[in-house]
Amino acid sequence: MDEKRGAFMAEYNLEKQHSKGKLHAIERIDMLLDDETFQEIELVKDRHYDGVIMGSGEISGKKVFLYVQDFTYKGGTLGRYHGRKISYLLDMAMKQKCPVIGVIDSGGARIQEGVKALAKYGDIFFTFVW
């Protein structure tokens, strides 16, 4: 496990999730994808991941895109950047004609960000139905 992934799975975060009978986002990715195939996609280098980890990988040798919400970061709530990342991933997957897996572990919209956070749900929904 690289240093960045280790930081996501700090002992505190693992204990917090495991005490609720849940896996951490990174553990979920590791269980879903073929070994050593996950490639994280970041919109802005060195920007915080904002409670959602996204990327591509393979399942039984077939390419898939996925995003996994991390409840240990602000309850997995969807904010503006979080929603922008998911929309970006959905667009990439559509262009490459690949399936998308979304693992939702969220408390909903990040109310502190107001209507701009709520609007991201509309962007994501629009991408799914367009």
Which positions does each model-derived feature cover?
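Terminal-region recognition feature
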Residues: 1-130
